[in-house]
Amino acid sequence: TLSETTDYTTSNSRLNAGILYDMTTISGEDLPDNIDKINGSHNGEGYIAYTFYLINSGKDTLSYDSEMTIENVTNGVDEAIRVELFVNGEKTVYGKTKSDGSGKESDCDKEFASSTEVMKDRREKLGPGEKDKYTVVIWLEGNDPDCVDKIIGGTMKLGMNFKIVETT
């Protein structure tokens, strides 16, 4: 079950973060320190932020796969996008491989998993009633060398999917 609150008074199988039109560039260093402490959609000027919970509402312990997919990109905006993912408070910053192919950008912890995936992971042994907290933050990194005029007006759509792979 997915929910925007810890008590999951309202639960869903699908959640949607708010859209930010005309996003301007910022530096990841300018993001608020408490960005993963606010539930639901909490966009700021220059970034999209969304916190939600995945709750095991069943009676069995389960393992699940998570993946963030790149569903649509225009104007090459993905070249300068950063995705910061907090899972239970642990932060990882993802970015596309440098244009010259020489690895990850210096402000990133990991490169995008592929041209169509930001990340993928497996969570083992989530017990009945337990919850995992996710915060997704997206911004245009102004210090990225690929953050140039040609990406102005570009759009990007991301999706995050969860799939149970095992129950005990």
Give a label for each model feature.
Residues N16, I26, I38, H42, ...:
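Intrinsically disordered, low-complexity segments enriched in small/polar residues
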Residues T1-L15, V73-T116:
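A surface/secretory-pathway sequence property marking extracellular, secreted
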Residues T1-I26, G154-M156, F162-T168:
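Short, polar/proline-rich extracytoplasmic segments that appear immediately after membrane translocation
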Residues N16-Y21, T25, G101, E105-S114, ...:
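A signal for specific C-terminal beta-sheet/loop modules enriched in small/flexible residues
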